[in-house]
Curated annotation (Swiss-Prot):
Lineage: Bacteria, Pseudomonadati, Chlorobiota, Chlorobiia, Chlorobiales
Pathway note: Amino-acid biosynthesis; L-tryptophan biosynthesis; L-tryptophan from chorismate: step 3/5
Gene Ontology BP terms: L-tryptophan biosynthetic process
Organism of this sequence: Chlorobium chlorochromatii (strain CaD3)
Isomerase in keyword set: yes
Key word Isomerase present: yes
Descriptive protein name: N-(5'-phosphoribosyl)anthranilate isomerase
Family, similarity comment: Belongs to the TrpF family.
GO molecular function: phosphoribosylanthranilate isomerase activity
Keyword tags: Amino-acid biosynthesis, Aromatic amino acid biosynthesis, Isomerase, Tryptophan biosynthesis
Amino acid sequence: MTHIQPKIKICGITRLEDALAATFAGADALGFNFSHTSARYIAPNNAAAIIKQLPPFVQTVGIFVEQSPSEINAIAQTCNLHYAQLHNDLYGVKEALAITTLPVIKVFRPNENFDVQEVKAFIGESHVTTYLFDAYRPDAHGGTGERIEATLAERIFQAMGNECYAILAGGLTPNNVAEAIRRIRPYGVDTASGVEKAPGIKDVAKMRAFVTAAQNA
């Protein structure tokens, strides 16, 4: 897509004060992690209570790892989510098409041998338009603080061109996000651990610094 100021998603929200602080810092979207294996897990009812108190125009994203499409549809309705982020390699085209209550963000965790044709095939078969690329680690589904190797990210994002909205995640912090944006030119950037005091507990100063760095890149 044509380069514009990148959209900013702050993920792993567990508290209302963090959600509001992220919003007022300038985040475009907030992520709520519904994976029971995550240190940033939030129960759907708690997420719904936070989302009800958000100001208008803030996008809300549910992160799903082990739920079925029917469970995702139900949680999305309970929480009034805008997007479902499918953060598990086991979610394929069939599962994406079965999520009918909201648009999907499909996550890929590329290793050095990653073939972008895998993404292009997914686009063609599912019509999903938004993809998030996170650092690969076989024992974890995101939130590790690890980065995608820069030349690998460049190769993927250049190859995708205008075919999708591509979001960069994985180890982004206030100190490195501007360089990553200038080099890779993603549609959006995503951070969780990079703006925290502890898993699920955000650092307001870091969130503000991250947003400022991303907007000024």
